[in-house]
Amino acid sequence: MAEEIKKPKKPVDPNSAKFKLGKIAGDAFASAIEAKKEGIPVAWVSSNFPVEIPETLGIATAYPENQAAGIAARGAGERMCNVAEADGYSNDICAYARVSLAYAKLKECPEQDVAMPDVLLCCNNICNCMIKWYENLARDLNIPMIILDIPFNPDYEVSDAEVEYVSAQFWDAVHQLEKLFGLKWDDEKFKQVTGFSCRASRAWLDATAQAKYVPSPFNGFDLLNHMAVMVTARGKEEAGEAMETLLKEYKENHLNGTSTFRAEEKYRIMFEGIACWPYLRATSHGLKDRGINMVTTIYADAFGFDYHSFDEMIKAYCSVPNAINLEKSRDKRIKLCKDNHVEGLL
């Protein structure tokens, strides 16, 4: 039987959103490693921590959640989890945490290396596991940890009292970092960073909203890849430019009757929760083979922070999916389903 000849992969257009976003995501880890070599402070940051703080202060950042997802997607999640479990961590705690704690011990992983941190920036508007995870990292690495307590909101709207509470912590975190590393806050730089962050967020949220068209101009699994940029680089100028390119491509796909979903779109679903990174391809192909397009997810939009003032920025960080009450959580999902003509949920 003749051997199957694989067709060479078509090179990615360097002007495409896929190329630009892939480069930004790939450069994020490399940039932090280079910064470390140059003596620039490096922070490990939880994904919903206000990126405006380290970006304004010039602190290099790396995101353990993003690293853990990459390691898992490349097939090394179990190996790293085994390292953490051998040190006594239970196998029923967060796999992100186990991979990260294992990396803190080994300080290397060929599937995704990252610069070791000088400080940890943590917030609990994602999950309370994050606090214990980062506390253990701080202990194991003997470095400071700064936490923003962004509490669960039992009310529908963010109160003035909550804005005041979180705002005070925001500035306290700034002052701690200034003192730790001899840095100085720059209001003009902060204004620039917030502009970059909002530009990227608006384009991203507009791009994800293009699923309002039937058929959708994109495969929803694209969002799970592209959102890495919103986690790691939304405060950078190049993120906004790349997201605007993505939005432009999705709009053109709609006008041209094309899509990155390479099958007939028979059904449209919403994906709930975190992607199963080790089985992302199996999930994507399993749905596509049945004509099912995952057109929206609460997860992807969670990393778009659009605001027009400091208080609105604080409210945005207090309004991420895991920090809001049941009624608001329900209404967000209902809106996504109605806006994007969803027929089922996974």
For each of these PLM feature ranges, what is it?
Residues A2-P41, S167, W171-Y299, F305:
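A charged, amphipathic alpha-helical module
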Residues F19-G22, C94-L101, V320-L326:
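Short, flexible loop segments at the rims of nucleotide/cofactor-binding pockets, characterized by
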Residues V42, D118-V119, R268, G344:
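Structural motif
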Residues W44-D113, D118, I126, W133-Y134:
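An N-terminal, globular interaction/scaffold subdomain
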Residues E55-E85, M270-N340:
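Redox- and metal-dependent alpha/beta enzyme cores, enriched for Fe-S-associated oxidoreductases
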Residues E85-D92, E164-Q176, I314-N322:
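A polyampholytic, Gly/Pro-enriched intrinsically disordered region
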Residues Y103-K105, P110-Q210:
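Internal, well-ordered alpha/beta segment that forms a basic, Gly-enriched binding/recognition surface
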Residues P117, C337, H341-L346:
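Proline-aspartate-enriched helix->loop->beta-strand connector
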